[in-house]
Amino acid sequence: MKTAGKSSLIAIRIVAFFLFVLSPSIFAKDLSGIYKEVIVQDFETDSFGEENIKAKLGPELNPEVRISTVFRTPERDSEKSLYVEVSAERNQSFQILFKKPWTSQEFVKEFSFHMYANEGGGSLFLLVRDSTLDMKKLLLTHFNFSGWKKVSLDISRKVRQDDLVTHKNSELVFLGFLYVAPFEMKRGAREVFVIDDILAKVRPKYLLFPGEKTLVK
């Protein structure tokens, strides 16, 4: 009888495991109402300029980076945005780093960005550091569009947000951006892109089952 009872318990655990793995939509439905939207950066108070740029070439080839009061997303009540202009003569890849990186101990599902572009052909990546302590480069968009556009990036399966050793909550750190220049630009051309309000969908981290040391993702 003990053997039969033990076998039944194992079978129940196996079924429960496969229900969890094969039916993520059930859990997603339960979790959908607990996400909240927070502002990561709205560019209303912080200053941005050459001090935020990290590039391999000399400062004389740095792009123009500044806060703009002219370019503002029509979707939100915005007064300022981050304006970046890259001329053909200064065509190079570079990083735009926050003076104070944004951090979150909550689980971050996605980031959303209100962006303007003039179809310049460059690409923009997010620079984040996850619980592995490695810096990750995540593709946000290719600048193959003109005008304003809301760009969302789901990072829930792209980075680790649980501590692999102690299983405690660990921070996700948003360091800034990496701009990758197009292979070539026509002489006299310029690429302009603007980043306005950056938002994140977050929820608390918690244990999956009592006594378990696995954080829900």
What residue spans do the PLM features occupy?
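N-terminal secretory signal peptides that target proteins for export/translocation
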Residues: 1-10
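Hydrophobic alpha-helical segments of integral membrane proteins
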Residues: 17-20
